[in-house]
Amino acid sequence: MKKGLVLATIFALCSTMMVSAKEFNDARWQWFYSNSDYTGKVDLNTLSYDPSTDTAQAWAVWVQTRGLQELREYDIHFDNSSVTIKHYYIYKNGSDTAINEGTANNTRTPAPGSGGEALIASVKGLVGRDTKLADYKKQQADEAQVQEQKRIEEQQAAEKKAKHERNRDILRGIFGI
């Protein structure tokens, strides 16, 4: 009876610890990079992309082998392959309480072959950047073409009106009207 009570208590404590610990293993977190020091995962639920600025927003977590997890909010600038770390939260493995947090606004270009470069490539594919940017550029070109056509038509109408006025003035001068 006592063994059962002890086992039930241990099970309850383990379950509570597992529920309250900060976990980055559910379906919303997709792996994008690993090395001997850390693993990077991106949050699929918070990805967004703005083709007018060619910038994506993403949250990523870096799970370190030394027992820390760093959750970061990024702006990813595809035009120059740089990232801006906006906010960060650092957790100890197994804890749901951040031991450090802050606002960084630190922009940098990741080194080739690094986790930051892998983050850019992963987010680029996940948000469909190339397709959305091509669609945006086509839409902008189409709108510019429509505006140019409208400008040409307005210019032609103004020239026609000016020619008509000039001819009318000439006829008035000839006939003395």
Where are these regions (language model features)?
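Sec-dependent N-terminal signal peptides
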Residues: 4-15
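N-terminal secretory-pathway/extracellular module detecting exported/lumenal segments
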Residues: 19-177
